[in-house]
């Protein structure tokens, strides 16, 4: 059956459903009402080899902020659910993704300790109708709710679409690396302490 997470999140602003399978093949069915976000989520599924289903309705007649953030929250929660106690995973992941002139580095740790260090310099304020300041908000929401330590670095790039897409591709590959099972660890917790904080807990 594989490692799976399913979240249904309802607020006064949005309703979001997320299902993720970590041991998938990259199947993706996404409809958030935010076209550019949908495009990026397809990159996440395809390059991470995650099976991903996301549906969202929200107050996009105002702007995309609430939907973007709540999709990130629900995705992070689903990811944390699928990882459970993180037993047997590699835990760390790192990837540098090029897209034409853009080059973005992502390093992450499924540590249970949320932190985001983000240094994308996206020239355009919007890509299509998508406000580029929402890119950071999305990753902060995912990391906080999945318990990820996440570092995102732009090494090169001038085209806004290329920079953001390279970021999502690098995140996908780093997350795939970190969440895959390490056959040498078998069922062990990947920590010298013998425990990792699960998403939503503190310690």
Swiss-Prot record:
In terms of superkingdom, the source organism counts as: Bacteria
Concerning Gene3D superfamilies, the annotation shows: Imidazole glycerol phosphate dehydratase, domain 1
Q: Which keywords, in A-to-Z order, does the entry hold?
A: Amino-acid biosynthesis, Cytoplasm, Histidine biosynthesis, Lyase
Pathway info: Amino-acid biosynthesis; L-histidine biosynthesis; L-histidine from 5-phospho-alpha-D-ribose 1-diphosphate: step 6/9
InterPro entries in alphabetical order: IGPD_sf, ImidazoleglycerolP_deHydtase, ImidazoleglycerP_deHydtase_CS, Ribosomal_Su5_D2-typ_SF
The biological processes this protein is annotated with in GO are:
L-histidine biosynthetic process
Protein EC: 4.2.1.19
Which top EC class is given?
Answer: lyase
- What CDD domains does the database record attribute to this sequence? IGPD
Q: Which reaction does it catalyse?
A: D-erythro-1-(imidazol-4-yl)glycerol 3-phosphate = 3-(imidazol-4-yl)-2-oxopropyl phosphate + H2O
Q: Which GO terms describe its molecular function?
A: imidazoleglycerol-phosphate dehydratase activity
Membrane-spanning residues = none
SUPFAM superfamilies to which the protein is assigned, alphabetical:
Ribosomal protein S5 domain 2-like
* One Pfam short name: IGPD
GO CC terms? cytoplasm
Question: Which compartment or compartments is the protein found in?
Answer: Cytoplasm
HAMAP family annotated for this entry? HisB
Q: Which PANTHER family match?
A: IMIDAZOLEGLYCEROL-PHOSPHATE DEHYDRATASE, IMIDAZOLEGLYCEROL-PHOSPHATE DEHYDRATASE HIS7
Which family does the similarity line name? Belongs to the imidazoleglycerol-phosphate dehydratase family.
* Protein name, per record: Imidazoleglycerol-phosphate dehydratase
Query: Which species does this protein come from?
Result: Synechococcus sp. (strain RCC307)
